[in-house]
Each structure stands twice: as C-alpha cells, then as structure tokens.
Amino acid sequence: MWQPRRPWPRVPWRWALALLALVGAGLCHAGPQPGYPARPSARNKNWCAYIVNKNVSCSVLEGSESFIQAQYNCAWNQMPCPSALVYRVNFRPRYVTRYKTVTQLEWRCCPGFRGGDCQEGPKDPVKTLRPTPARPRNSLKKATDNEPSQFSEPRKTLSPTGTAQPSWGVDPKEGPQELQEKKIQVLEEKVLRLTRTVLDLQSSLAGVSENLKHATQDDASRTRAPGLSSQHPKPDTTVSGDTETGQSPGVFNTKESGMKDIKSELAEVKDTLKNKSDKLEELDGKVKGYEGQLRQLQEAAQGPTVTMTTNELYQAYVDSKIDALREELMEGMDRKLADLKNSCEYKLTGLQQQCDDYGSSYLGVIELIGEKETSLRKEINNLRARLQEPSAQANCCDSEKNGDIGQQIKTLDQKIERVAEATRMLNGRLDNEFDRLIVPEPDVDFDAKWNELDARINVTEKNAEEHCFYIEETLRGAINGEVGDLKQLVDQKIQSLEDRLGSVLLQMTNNTGAELSPPGAAALPGVSGSGDERVMMELNHLKDKVQVVEDICLLNIQGKPHGMEGALPNREDRAVRDSLHLLKSLNDTMHRKFQETEQTIQKLQQDFSFLYSQLNHTENDVTHLQKEMSNCRAGENAGMGRFTKVGEQERTVDTLPSPQHPVAHCCSQLEERWQRLQSQVISELDACKECTQGVQREVSMVEGRVSHMEKTCSKLDSISGNLQRIKEGLNKHVSSLWNCVRQMNGTLRSHSRDISGLKNSVQQFYSHVFQISTDLQDLVKFQPSAKAPSPPPPAEAPKEPLQPEPAPPRPSGPATAEDPGRRPVLPQRPPEERPPQPPGSTGVIAETGQAGPPAGAGVSGRGLPRGVDGQTGSGTVPGAEGFAGAPGYPKSPPVASPGAPVPSLVSFSAGLTQKPFPSDGGVVLFNKVLVNDGDVYNPSTGVFTAPYDGRYLITATLTPERDAYVEAVLSVSNASVAQLHTAGYRREFLEYHRPPGALHTCGGPGAFHLIVHLKAGDAVNVVVTGGKLAHTDFDEMYSTFSGVFLYPFLSHL
C-alpha cells in the first residue's frame, strides 16, 4: 500500500493528464465499443432486456494510518549533500473490501424461447447447431466469466427493393402481422439501445464532472498545506507541501515543551494528508482502469493515431451516432412500409378474388333476369290482349267479390316497393363502406392502392346494380305468375258455375215440361249460394298464401343488417333512377291490368246477379201460371158438371171452348216467354263463359306464382347472407388497415420524442464538453511550474500560494474559495439523491427519468423495479428479471396549449358581380369566390368565420357608383372595427354652416387594410350604411373582400 511520494510540484501535471485520460475513456465508453460485438436485439428478435441486480465488490476507504518515513534532504545525483536523515510522519489510507448492489440491463432469452442462441421457440423445438451469438456487455463494466463466448452473428442484408431479407431465425410460416410486430419490436429495441448509450454518456460525463470537482478541491487543499507547514520552519529540514518535518528521535526527547504544538500541527497535517491520500488513491485507481480500457480500445481499433482536436473528435463521434440513428430509423420505416404494402396487397387480392366470384354469380343472375324479362313481357302482352276482348260484353259478375283481389294486388305493390327500398338500403350501405375505403389517410400515401380498390368497388357496385335488376325481374315474373294463376283459378270457378247453371237450367226445363213444378227453380238459389261460398273459400285461400309470402319477404328485409341504409353515390344515381322508373312502370302496368281484370270480374258478377234475378222472376211467373192453370181446371170441371146435370141444354157444350181459349192462349204465351228466356240465358251463359275463361286461367296461375315468389324470397335470403359476409370481410380489412396506420403513427410519435430527447442530450453534451475543456485549460494554465522548490529564507514570511480560479458552480453545491488559514475540511459526502430535474435548468447532466417497470412490479435493492420470474440467466447472482421500460425524457416546451387546434393554411378572396343586397344597405354579399382555402367564407351570407385564434390580415375594397359615395363599416362579431367614407371625414357641426347649393364631394373607391386579432368563431363582414355600391351585370369585379391567416396567437406558440 505504501509507495515513495514524488515531489509535489509534479503532481498537478499528473492529475491533468489523468483527467484527460478519464474524459477520453468516458467518451469512448459512452457508445458501443468497437471491440465488442453488436447488441443481439439489433439482429435477432428473440432477445429481451431484463433489469438485474448484481453484487459487486469494491474497495471502501475506512480511515487512515500513520507511519514514519526516512527521507534524504537532497535530490538524486546531488553529490555535495549532507547525510543527515529527516524523518517525516506520513499518512496512508486504509481500505477494506465491501459489497454493493448495482442495477444494469442484461440481455436474455424472451419468454417462450430457449437455447444458447435463443432460437428454439414453441413452433420449432428442434434446431440445428449454430454459432452462439455474442452477449452484450455493460458499457461501464467488464465482462464476467460466466458470460458465453463471443461469436459474430450474420447480419441481415437488404434486398434491392429495400426490404429486409429474412434471417435464419425467422419462421417462414409466420404471417404478415407477426412480421410487422417483430419489426416494430426491433425498432423499439434500437431506440432503447440508443437511449442506453446516451444515458451511459451522461453518467460518464457526470462522473468526469464530479472527479474534476474533487480534483479541484484537492488541489486547493494541497496549495494550502505549504502555508501551514511554513509557519514552524526548522533550520535543518526541508519544508514540503503536505508533510510535517521532524528531527531524529533524540531531538524530540530533548524538547518536551514543544510537543503539544507539534501534536496539534501534526493533527491538522494528518487530516489534510488523509484527504489528499484518499483522493489520490481513488484517482490513481480510476486512471489505471481508464488506461487499461483505453489500451483495449486502441488494440481493438488498430487505427492510426487520432490527430484531431478534442472538439472535432466529439463532433465526429456525435455525428456518427446521429447518422447511425438516422439510418436505423429510415431502414425500420422502409421495412415497416414494405410490410404494410405487402399486407395491403394480400388483403386486396383476396377481396378482388371474392368480388370476381360474386361477379360471375351476378352474370348468371343477369342472364336469368333477361330470360324472365322476355317471358314477362310476352305474358303481359297476352294478358293485355285477352283483357281487351271482353270489354264490350255484358256484365255478369258481382263487383263485391273482387275487392280482395284488388287489396292483394296493392299488397303485392307494397311488397315490391319494400324489396326495392331494401335493395337501395343495401346498395347505400355498400357505397358508404366503399367511400370510407376510398378516402385515404392524410399521413399515408396509398394512391395507387386506393385507385385499384376504387376500380374493384366499381365492379362490385355494378354487380349490386345487376342484382337489383335481377330482383326486379324476378318480382315481375312472380307477379305475372300470380296473376296468371289467379286468372286460371277464376276460369275454373266460372266453368264450374257454368256447369252448375246448365244443370239447374236443364232441371228447370224438365220440371217445367212436367207441369212446370217449382222445386227445380227453388233449388237454383241454393246451388248458386254454394258456388259463391266455394269462390270465397278459394279467394280466402289465395289471400292466405299471399299473406305468407308477404311475411317471408318482411322477415328477409328485417333480417338484413340495420346499418346497410345510406345514400347511393352520385355516379349510381342514374342507374338507380332507371331501376326505380322500371319498377314504377311495372307497378303501373300491373296495377292497370289488375284493375281491368277487376272490372271484368265485376261485369261477370253483375251478369250473374242479373241472371239470378231473371231466374227468380221466371220462378215467380211459373208459380203464377201454375195457380192460373189450377184455377182454370177447377172452373172447367165445375161447368161440365153443371151442364151434365141439366142434360137437356146441349147447346152449352159449344160454349165450353170459350173458357178453354184463354187457357190455351196463356200456355202458348208462357211457352214463348220460356223459349225467349232460355235463349237469353244460353246467350248470356256463352258470353259469361267467353269473358271468364281468361280470368279463370289468370286466377289459377296465382298459386304457382306465389310459390315462385316464395322461392325468390329464399334466394334473396342467400343473397343477403352473401352481402353480410362481404360486409364483415370489408370491416375486418378496414379495421386491420386502420390498426396498422395507428401503430405506425404511434411508432413515429415515439421516435420523434426520442429524437428530440437525443437532440437535447447532444446539446447538453456539447455545453458540458465545452465546460470541461474550459476547466482543463484553466487547470493547466494556473498550475505551478515543475521545478523543485528551494527552501524559503527563514527570515521571510511565507507567501500565500497561488490558487486556481474556482470552477464553475455545480448543482451539487456551489464552489467557494477557501481561506488558506482555515482548517482543512473533511471530504464532502456524496450528494443525496433527489428527483431528476429538466435538462438545461442546471449545469449538470442527469437522467431525466428512470427505467420503466418490467412485467409484474416488485421492488428490491435500492427501490428499483423488479420483473416477474423470467428465464434463468447464466449469472449466479440472483436479481430482478423482466422487460425493461424506456427511460423518461425531458418534456419539450409545448408548441400549443392542450386542446388548441393545429393551425393550417386559411385564406379567402371574393368579389362582387351582382347587386349586393336588396335594400339600400346591409351586409355586402361578395358572390364570386376566387380563393377559399379552409372553406371559411360563406358567399351566401358574406361572412368570414375565423377557424383559429390568431392574427389575420383583412382587406376590402369598395367602389361606389359614378357621382355617388359609399359609407361602410368593417364589423367583427357585430362590433365596428373601422369606418369608411369615400367622400372623406366630415365634422358634424359643419353640416349646419354649409352654404346652400354646395356640391357634394363623392370621392373615389375606399379600402380596408388592417391586421386584426380574431378568436375562433368570430364573424367578419362588410356592412354598407350609406351610398350606392357599384355593381355590373357582367363578370366584372369592382369591389373585393379578402383575408388571410398570418400566425396563431402568441400564447399558443
């Protein structure tokens, strides 16, 4: 521990050299060392940073011990020198070995990975043997023996397209999302490595500043010590700057009276030497350590000797670090954008394929629609021709029986309208989704991709339109089918009624021939009533089927997603209008045809009612005839009995035909009437049969058309499901795209914050390097010469030693000039820990934040965060493990207050080409807009609304008509800011003294031109209060109104 002490005048030069070496070593240690391998996270994504606590041994000063050293009074190689020895009492420090806990970052395998190179993951348990990657060493500590051997790892190369080639550690089966997440993790690790480098550089500079402060204090104590020792000079001893001279032991025994003074002085010298010895030993150890590190760095670099100055070296080092950071950031951004591009292309390819599939299906639907349309037109023409034929026939049907059919037709029209509305809603929702996909993000340039997506969306819209046409034609065919079925059913029912009526008439004829008995005629109403009941039953059954079809259609419409409604895009309005026109024309045609059918059925019902009334009247006539015949027969029998009883009056027999003649005449008349009635009924039956044949066929076809409509509704269900799947797929793609964009924005914001923090740190680094250089120059300038001092004359009083200038103040405590006559103080205690201050507030570089807590927070050691149990590392010392968070950075001054909008370009300019207002005055409506950036000026109201708080330049030029004037006011939020009068300012009292007949001065055009402060939402306009403002009927502007946003309000800067 003890070494011979060198002469004191040479010590300060040694300190200066040691400080220079310390500064160089600290700067070299701040960044990644050239001899060490690169950090694994820069090339491999399976390494994770853990915060660990380790116990390290260190030598701690524990007091000092004194010893007596014999010294010669003369220097080396000085021949004429007395041989008397001088004994000096010196002090040396005493050190003991202690242990302390330090916290550092250590790279270990991430959870789920294992192996020597952390390449064995959950998907690939067996890996071939590859070189073990190098484990990063702490930039402020040496590598321990338990770290694995260092091997170089192959770097990733970039392809010509700028994308990173996958390394052997990346699973080729991973999808684009996993690759993006891993690349983002690589960027975060790179930023963390740069942050760690800057923090190490700050800690090194802080240590250099602290050592420089201690060295300055030691230098001051050393220069103060010769003054203390020179107060008691001895005639045969050499005065030194830090020791107390003494004579041989015999001399001490002879001077008992001066021992107390010597002991007190020895105590003072002991304290001083103790402090100096401690500092020298500490500085010596640090210098040796830095010299060894410098030697290693020089051997690893194997480059020529640096001939640059210190500032140029610092500048080159910082520039290299900033360039490396820029290259890494740009490379990461290129990779991220390439991954996003590949992902978007993959998703768009899948979407295109799906749209192509639906397009092929829609083409088949279009062909089917064409066929259905052709058949529908043919059926409509046939139905129109059939319905026009029986228009001149007599009415034979009851109009009350056809009310249900009209109601059903109206219901079918409502259903068609509902289906069309549902189709429009689906198309509108699809258009909204496509419009949202077409609108690009302002921060990302995907013009080519959006154009391609727009083209594919147009194809999808066209297919949707064709699908609408398909639905229209299908419904049209279903309606025609139902109408045909209804006609067929009516024909069948009328045929059955004709058959029954024929049988009734035949029975009536038979009964009339058999003495015209009434039972046959009485049975006609019953038969007719049963036929009507069957017709009503059939119509009710048809109504029920139509109601079922309506319920199915309503369920299909309600089953569609509620968010599909929306307005059709402008480019599809024409197609939609055409579709609606076709639907309306179809509805009108069907409604007209159904009305004609209804009229025909009513005529048939009227004919049936008339026939029923005729039959009833015939039945009454037959009954009356039967009564007359019975009366006639009774009278005949009575007359014959009376003439028989008389016997002698035979002449009365000739008179018997007289009562029989009316009977014969009545029978013949009744027979003629019956013949006419029969012929009329037969003719009417033929007419009714001809009229109702088409209706019967159409009614019979309604049931088949209803079933066809049910099938169409089932097809609509499948189409609705396909549209729902398309919507879900589009929503997934859009949400994934927005997630990627948000992740990119977050990464860019974090990188921006990191770059700003690095810039601040570099600026502070420059300032502190400049301070250190200044301090070193001051130390070198004010150090005493290296020559050996000669003993001062005993008669002269000791001079006060030259002291260096005080160092600049430090945050740990202000440096004060010490008085040489005061007792030396003990070494200062290390400064207490306090929360970090913002950079620039003090002169010291300190970390502005601590590492964030790892996963699972636990506190141990000195209160640092401890992670959850991770994978066991190679070290033997237990410590907290977990993912390390990024340290904090100084908060940059806010550019704008929270919540204040970011100002953008705002300007407008408008002119007047028409009459500004209907009355004589008011707000001028500058109708012709030339520029309106930000859409801040409303030409319909003539008001400019300020979007932000700030300064605005407002300009207005008003031109009156010839031989007229204009008086106007510039209004801001209904408050007058400036006035204008083209005739000039006038005082009110002059108006009373103006001579009569004086000319009115009109003047020329007037203008407002001023800078005003506006708040967000303030309204600015020009109000004319008098005069006439010039305007023309042509596109010529004589009055203008302009404004521009200059800069935001100063409180937001």
Swiss-Prot record:
GO terms for molecular function: extracellular matrix constituent conferring elasticity. Highest levels are present in fetal heart and adult lung. Intermediate levels in peripheral leukocytes, placenta, and spinal cord and low expression in fetal brain, spleen, thymus, and lung and in adult heart, aorta, testis, bone marrow, small intestine, thymus, lymph node, and appendix. Residues 212-222 have a biased composition (Basic and acidic residues). Homotrimer associated through a moderately stable interaction of the C-terminal globular C1q domains, allowing the nucleation of the triple helix and then a further quaternary assembly to higher-order polymers via intermolecular disulfide bonds. Interacts with EMILIN1. Residues 1-30 form the signal peptide. Glycans are attached at N55, N275, N458, N510, N587, N616, N745, N974. It is found in: Secreted, Extracellular space, Extracellular matrix. This is EMILIN-2. Keywords: Cell adhesion, Coiled coil, Collagen, Disulfide bond, Extracellular matrix, Glycoprotein, Secreted, Signal. Pfam families: C1q, EMI. Residues 120-179, 212-256, 783-901 are annotated as: Disordered. Disulfide bonds join C48-C110, C74-C81, C109-C118. InterPro entries: C1q_dom, Collagen/C1q_domain, EMI_domain, Tumour_necrosis_fac-like_dom. Residues 840-892 form the Collagen-like domain. May be responsible for anchoring smooth muscle cells to elastic fibers, and may be involved not only in the formation of the elastic fiber, but also in the processes that regulate vessel assembly. Has cell adhesive capacity. Residues 901-1052 form the C1q domain. One of its GO terms (biological process) is positive regulation of apoptotic process. PROSITE patterns: C1Q, EMI. SUPFAM superfamilies: TNF-like. Residues 177-215, 253-340, 369-389, 578-634 form a coiled coil. Residues 146-166, 228-256 have a biased composition (Polar residues). Transmembrane segments: none annotated. One of its GO terms (cellular component) is collagen trimer. It comes from Homo sapiens. Residues 44-120 form the EMI domain.
